[in-house]
Each structure stands twice: as C-alpha cells, then as structure tokens.
C-alpha cells in the first residue's frame, strides 16, 4: 500500500493504516517459523520468541514481561485425542473461556508497557460480536495506562457474553450497546482510528492489529510441535482472523497441509469464500 513502514514500537499501538489497509510484515521482517518446532520452549516462551522473530526490538517489551497475567494456571493449550489421528486443541482455559484470550492477554500487556515507556495514557476501542469484547476487557482491566471502550450490537450478543462485558466494574472500562450490527460497530472503530481527535494514543485490539495475529499464530506453532508429520487443521470460524493466523504460520514454514474453515448458520465467511 501507500502507507509508510512502521517499527515494532509503532505497530503495538497501531490499527488501520493511512491507506485504510492493514499493517503486515515485509518479506524481510519475519524469519521462517519452522525452526520453532524444534525448540523445547514453554508456551509463554513460544509467544515471546514469535514476537522477537517479528522484530528484534520487541525483546525489551516481552523478555521479562508476564504476558498471560489473566490465566490462573499455565496457558499451555490442551490437546485431547478424539479418535485415531483426530485431536481437539482446547483454547478455552483463559479468563473468558475464549480462544481470544491467547492473543489479547499478551497484546494488552505489551501495549501497557509501551504506553508506560512513552509516559502516555492509551484508549483502546474495540468492536465486538461477543468474545473479543470480554477478552479485551480482561486483557487491560488492570492496566495502569489504558482505558477501554467496547462497542457491541444491542441485543445481538448472548446473555453470557453481555454479562462478561458489562459486569466488569472498573474505572477504565466502558461498554456501549450500538443499535445496529457488528459491522456498524466495526465501522465506527475504523473511523475513530483513522480520525483521531482524542489527543491521545488510540489503540485497536481487534484483528486489525497485526500483533494479535502473531499471538494467534503461537498456538499453531505449539500444535505442530506435538506431531512428527504435517497436519490438517479444521478451525471454527466466525471470521478469517484465526484461520489467517494458521495460514500465515504455514506460509512461514510450519508443517500444515490443509486448513478448513468450519462455520455454523452464521455463514458469512463460508459464503464469501
């Protein structure tokens, strides 16, 4: 695109690019990920290694940082055998029981550290159809340098998801129900990110933030390490962010064959593909 290249420090707090596209790594920004499958690392070190592979300057943000503060136990995913050669990777052991905790917890911690370094207070604006909002809130609710505003479509999230978001009582957390769809919420977020009149750092934790995709790639790195041959992956998909993370890992050397996107009656992605 026509947008300028940004450093790792800039990407932490960035969302939509000036040309309305998304920031992506250049061909020289990220080393091949295949070597990670040969390393004996804890899961948390997997994530840190991926961020450092993205940019060596990230080391000062992650090496001594607890990037899964909301997890009551180890963030290592659980792999359960269903039958011969079929397994389920469980990603619901985080604070909100959503796979999104695995990417948002590190991103929230890293963003808080970056803002502390700058001596600034950031504003996170998130659009959600349910899971992202609660996971984002849990990622930053104890942050010293971040306030968060979550937009969700009124009466279009489950009662469980609504309560996960609206029952967090913190001075730095604000929930807003929007009359409209999730896309309406997302359009508001994109407009605010492009036309920042808040006189402060505005941050997105949606999948438009590249570091969130990297955090999701981490559990595919871990998954491929559990097998001695390439695997196929079927991913429950509301949108393409999670599947894209698997694709990105495959493109950078992870032993993944086919990637299947599975959807329910909410089949917008299926119809799009």
Q: PLM ranges: what are they?
A:
Residues 1-273:
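PLP-dependent amino-acid enzyme catalytic core
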């Amino acid at each position: 695109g026509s947008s300028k290249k940004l450093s790792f420090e800039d990407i932490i707090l960035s969302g939509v690019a000036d040309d309305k596209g998304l920031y992506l790594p250049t061909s020289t920004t990220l080393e091949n990920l295949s070597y990670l499958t040969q390393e004996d690392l804890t899961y948390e070190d997997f994530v840190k290694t991926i961020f450092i592979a993205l940019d060596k300057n990230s080391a000062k943000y992650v090496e001594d940082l607890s990037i899964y503060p909301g997890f009551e136990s180890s963030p290592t995913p659980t792999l359960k055998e269903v039958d011969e050669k079929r397994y389920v990777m469980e990603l619901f052991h985080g604070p909100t029981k959503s796979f999104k905790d695995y990417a948002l917890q590190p991103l929230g911690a890293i963003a808080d550290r970056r803002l502390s370094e700058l001596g600034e207070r950031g504003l996170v604006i998130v659009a959600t159809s349910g899971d992202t909002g609660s996971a984002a809130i849990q990622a930053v609710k104890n942050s010293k340098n971040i306030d968060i505003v979550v937009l969700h479509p009124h009466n279009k999230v489950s009662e469980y998801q609504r309560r996960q978001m609206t029952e967090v009582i913190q001075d730095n957390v604000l929930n807003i129900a929007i009359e409209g769809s999730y896309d309406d919420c997302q359009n508001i977020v994109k407009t605010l990110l492009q036309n920042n009149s808040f006189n402060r750092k505005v941050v997105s934790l949606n999948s438009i933030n590249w570091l969130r995709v990297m955090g999701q790639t981490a559990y595919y790195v871990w998954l491929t390490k559990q097998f001695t041959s390439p695997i196929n992956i079927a991913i429950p998909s509301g949108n393409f962010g999670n599947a894209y993370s698997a694709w990105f890992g495959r493109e950078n050397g992870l032993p993944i064959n086919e990637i299947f996107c599975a959807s329910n009656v909410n089949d917008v992605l299926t119809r799009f593909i």
